[in-house]
From Swiss-Prot:
Basic residues: compositionally biased ranges: 22-31
GO cellular component: cytosolic ribosome; cytosolic small ribosomal subunit; plasma membrane
Name of encoding gene: RPS25E
One Pfam family matching this protein: Ribosomal_S25
GO molecular function, one term: structural constituent of ribosome
Name of the protein this chain belongs to: Small ribosomal subunit protein eS25w
Disordered as annotated region, ranges: 1-36
Keyword terms of this UniProt record: Ribonucleoprotein, Ribosomal protein
InterPro entries to which the protein is assigned, alphabetical: Ribosomal_eS25
Record has Ribosomal protein as a keyword: yes
Amino acid sequence: MAPKKDKVPPPSSKPAKSGGGKQKKKKWSKGKQKEKVNNMVLFDQATYDKLLTEAPKFKLITPSILSDRMRINGSLARRAIRELMAKGVIRMVAAHSSQQIYTRATNT
């Protein structure tokens, strides 16, 4: 019979532990700040014309989408939607206390 070899544990990739050393302190990350948007509070003629021509072509119309695309504030966007509804160029899809969804008016 061949002589028995001593079992040696495989070398581990972790370094040997050296006493209860202090862990590296976590750094605080710099919080990302959103850029302030300077939206209009009143319509100028160019923006109003753009609203009347482009908004009825949107597939989905909400106050937040109008506010984003037209650079107008939320209350102005709600007023604009109310006016487009009165003219009959958009129709309501769903209404909730905090979110109203509209779409372009089709023949149906």
